[in-house]
Amino acid sequence: DSADRHTLSLVMSPDRIVVPSRDDPLARSASRVIGGPLGRYAVPLARGWRHLAALLVAASMVPMALSAALRGYCVEGGWRSPDQFFHMCFSDVPATFGNSNLGAGVGAFLAGGADAPTPEQPPLLALLSTLTGGLIPDGTPETRARLFFGVWALLLTVALALTVWWTARSLPRMPLRASHIALSPVVALTALVAPDLVGVALTAAALWAWSSDRMRWAGVWLGLAILTVHYPVIVLVAICLVAVRAGRWGEVRTLVGMTLVTVAAVFGLVAWRNPTGAVQSYVGWMQSSAGFGSPWVGPQLAGSPLPTVAVTALAAAGWVAALMAGAFFALGAPRRPGVAEVSLVMLVIVLVTAKAFPVQASLWLVPLVALVGLRWREHLWWAGAEALHFGAVWLYLAGVSVPDRGLPSGWYLVALAARLVAVVWLAVAVWRMAWRRPAANPEELTPPESDPLAGPLTGAPDALLVKVV
């Protein structure tokens, strides 16, 4: 079928320029709005990838503007319950400012003590939050929260633009794949719910640096990303697994070393000045029970919550399952899968087994969907499920305060299940796409490379392959 031809073409001609309006039926239909698909005799990338990347960066302002407009009611009237849930304009950004004393500034955070800010965030985000919080002038709590939200809206807009740019730069022969980020409905819904886009942008920079053989910079960016949330650890593991198959572990040691040095340096600085603040988010995770978006919240909504230790064990088991699946995928596929493909499969397993799977966590999947080259059809089906769950979770929370107007728990669980199925389908689609590629010819010393992010592994033959019987 067309999907098979699409997959095979990327293997047999890995250097060909990919034009979505030619290869993706949905993109071809949508292109009619701006003049139709690229002509038969037109020269793809005639003006270079930078031109298209700049256009996509500009286009990314559209979902960001929609995300800001969605929060308009709360910006004007304040983030108050249950209205912020009925109007679906909740954001962790102003909530953290008000609840964690971020206005005291980064100096107070590093000084520690009873009056220090207490953001339950990993070290780098805590530093950024307190740094920006200290810039907010005195005023009423509502005005200060509004200003803080505005500052972070600008920062996250820049982070989204950088994510689009770095992704397009990682795919110089197929930069339009970054449109999956610039035009994603998932971004429009969740970009301003929390500061996750900071870590997403840092991870995109790390993947570009890896693909360009800039190992030290890749380690720095990836280390900083890990200091915003733990998901980038999956990318590091995926790179290591793919490198093991290629037999080029030496090229990865610099990356791993710089990642560890960066994490140790920033974490050590914060821990030296404020030990409690450095570990607060990790302690909070250990002590938390099942949260929204997680399948483990089902028993809680049914009136029989799982013990915290059981939820922690299930989440840890999810990480183990992700590592095992990632290793099998990376080492057992007929042809070496790409770094982004292994990362996406592992990330999906971690997300759907996590203690909580908040709406903004899906932002981490968006760049990977772009990098692996999924079609827009899969993207939009997934985005539809995300939108369904997005509305359901806020209406359920509103119903906690106003039961006769909110969403019953049973209907919320239906929306949650639909989202989990859609996210798992992304991993299935990537798995099938990678498994359909024919094995490399063992007689070729430098087999054609199908991974645009291969970096130092480009053209490497398999050194370790697990045969699947």
Where do the PLM segments sit?
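Membrane-lumen/periplasm interface segments of specific transmembrane helices
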Residues: 251-322
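TM-lumen/periplasm interface segments of multi-pass membrane proteins
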Residues: 4-172
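Membrane-interface alpha helices of multi-pass inner-membrane proteins
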Residues: 186-189, 205-207, 216-242, 265, ...
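Aromatic-enriched
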Residues: 381-469
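Aromatic/glycine/proline-enriched transmembrane-helix motif characteristic
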Residues: 292-353, 431-469
